[in-house]
Amino acid sequence: MKYLLPSAAAGLLLLAAQPTMAANTGGYATTDGGDVAGAVKKTARSMQDIIDIIEAAKLDSNGKKVKGGAYPLVITYNGNEDALIKAAENDICGQWKKDARGVEIKEFTKGITIIGTNGSSANFGIWLTKSSDIVIRNMRFGYMPGGAQDGDAIRIDNTPNVWIDHNEIFAKNFECAGTKDGDTTFESAIDIKKASTNVTVSYNYIHGIKKVGLSGFSSSDTGRDLTYHHNIYDDVNARLPLQRGGQVHAYNNLYTGITSSGLNVRQKGIALIERNWFENAKNPVTSRYDGSNFGTWELRNNNVMSPADFAKYNITWDKDTKPYVNAEDWKSTGTFASVPYSYSPVSAQCVKDKLANYAGVNKNLAVLTAANCN
């Protein structure tokens, strides 16, 4: 089922002109990004503009490099790459061999917020390395080139305290013949790895993605705390996320059209899966592909309450060639530690009925509350 997300306003709206955001992200992240005292505010019309603005912010007034950055940044992006996105859509199998395009934010810890204006779009990614306090909001990422070069839409490496909020990320849930490793027509929507922790992923609309996201890249990269809330995943294959160890809190998400597997909890990780809506989903909660060190989950107040609901919501299961655990009995296998932040989840039914009005871009960063569920 294709979800059509309505726009909250027409035309180009400079979202950065809104009041300073609160650091309560509804998850483990506690950052305002660059939207703090002393911030320098810039407008970018292109990927290169963003790169140049960030590079300039690494230097003091004398042109000397400052460790961690010279000042916090708020970058408003108003570029439009719809033509590149459309060309990529018309040449799906030609994208993976192209060079990856992206903005690398490396070793910047002063804080950066990148926020798109309504109507903006990007055919490039944003890649974080050894940085902290980064916020990415209202960005529309489509059909990233460079699948063979790890051309993710958003990549978070060695970077704590990140908020990914109200974005749209999309491609084609399809694999072209001859791709590198057999699965790189397009790379990930959001990969979080290499000791990155305290990350909140919220109110994003992610569709047509084969490999949605990693939480950890190896069996030794396991310690992180991540929150995924109020996201819509539509026509996606797997990795919602692929969790290697650590803790994941997934609440008030809508999962529809999962073609391989959903939340894959591995390497002794634990996930609190709370008040989500699952439909038309294959293996929505599982631990597979490792063959050992299974993860565990606590299932709390989702629309699916027992195996009796599987047929109603078209929930199906299959086996793996290695040892695996599926949530086929729809029972909790672990107990999640207390959640250390405040959050106010709505019912799973409200997620189904109302979330499309709030998730994704061009929604003026609106959030879904119980008052909106009536």
Curated annotation (Swiss-Prot):
<keyword id="KW-0732">Signal</keyword>
<feature type="disulfide bond">
    <location>
        <begin position="350"/>
        <end position="373"/>
    </location>
</feature>
<feature type="binding site">
    <location>
        <position position="152"/>
    </location>
    <ligand>
        <name>Ca(2+)</name>
    </ligand>
</feature>
<feature type="signal peptide">
    <location>
        <begin position="1"/>
        <end position="22"/>
    </location>
</feature>
<keyword id="KW-0456">Lyase</keyword>
<dbReference type="InterPro" id="IPR045032">
    <property type="entry name" value="PEL"/>
</dbReference>
<feature type="disulfide bond">
    <location>
        <begin position="93"/>
        <end position="176"/>
    </location>
</feature>
<keyword id="KW-0479">Metal-binding</keyword>
<feature type="binding site">
    <location>
        <position position="191"/>
    </location>
    <ligand>
        <name>Ca(2+)</name>
    </ligand>
</feature>
<dbReference type="GO" id="GO:0045490">
    <property type="term" value="P:pectin catabolic process"/>
</dbReference>
<protein>
    <recommendedName>
        <fullName>Pectate lyase 3</fullName>
        <ecNumber>4.2.2.2</ecNumber>
    </recommendedName>
</protein>
<dbReference type="GO" id="GO:0046872">
    <property type="term" value="F:metal ion binding"/>
</dbReference>
<dbReference type="InterPro" id="IPR012334">
    <property type="entry name" value="Pectin_lyas_fold"/>
</dbReference>
<feature type="binding site">
    <location>
        <position position="150"/>
    </location>
    <ligand>
        <name>Ca(2+)</name>
    </ligand>
</feature>
<dbReference type="Pfam" id="PF00544">
    <property type="entry name" value="Pectate_lyase_4"/>
</dbReference>
<feature type="active site">
    <location>
        <position position="239"/>
    </location>
</feature>
<keyword id="KW-0964">Secreted</keyword>
<dbReference type="GO" id="GO:0005576">
    <property type="term" value="C:extracellular region"/>
</dbReference>
<comment type="function">
    <text>Involved in maceration and soft-rotting of plant tissue.</text>
</comment>
<comment type="similarity">
    <text>Belongs to the polysaccharide lyase 1 family. PLADES subfamily.</text>
</comment>
<dbReference type="InterPro" id="IPR002022">
    <property type="entry name" value="Pec_lyase"/>
</dbReference>
<feature type="binding site">
    <location>
        <position position="187"/>
    </location>
    <ligand>
        <name>Ca(2+)</name>
    </ligand>
</feature>
<dbReference type="InterPro" id="IPR011050">
    <property type="entry name" value="Pectin_lyase_fold/virulence"/>
</dbReference>
<keyword id="KW-0106">Calcium</keyword>
<keyword id="KW-1015">Disulfide bond</keyword>
<comment type="pathway">
    <text>Glycan metabolism; pectin degradation; 2-dehydro-3-deoxy-D-gluconate from pectin: step 2/5.</text>
</comment>
<dbReference type="GO" id="GO:0030570">
    <property type="term" value="F:pectate lyase activity"/>
</dbReference>
